[in-house]
Amino acid sequence: MKIGFAFCGSFCNHPELLKIYEQIAQEHEVVPILSENAAKYDTRFGRADAFVERVESLASRRAVRDIVEAEPLGPQGAMEVLVIAPCTGNTLAKLAGGITDGPVTMAAKGHLRNAKPVVLAIATNDGLSASAPNIAALLNRKNYYFVPFGQDNAEAKPTSLIADFTQIIPTVELALEGRQLQPLLL
């Protein structure tokens, strides 16, 4: 199976997601896609060049890094499913609003034109505040599927939501059948 895997800039989640990504890459052909932020920013969680190198090495191919590279993915039918993980509040807003201004949102737009599933693994500090309407909008749209999610450290960050990244593969399997993995809320 050919799986698109798009990383956005929730940098603290990259190490955990790389483990899931590695599992997927061992069993499937992966099309790596990086948001511009994920590809270029060095943070306290790691250097961008090391992250990009690891993503590309595991997939044995260059990552899609801009709109021009992402645009042909849809018309070519390049993927059976697209996973966006971590899907940030910013990306949720763009998807909900139909804004296509980067490689991840362009890949999603092109993929959806083929009526194929997009799996979102959210990681956002404002999931129960500013991002809540965007989550609701996408839950109500065809071909979007969510990795089950819940509050992330409810005492310290009461509006923060995070997907259970270990559920990405089961979510993908059901999304390919047109079904949402349940329970959705953890």
Predicted regions and their residues:
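A cross-family phosphate/adenosyl-ligand binding-site feature
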Residues: 1-118, 125-186
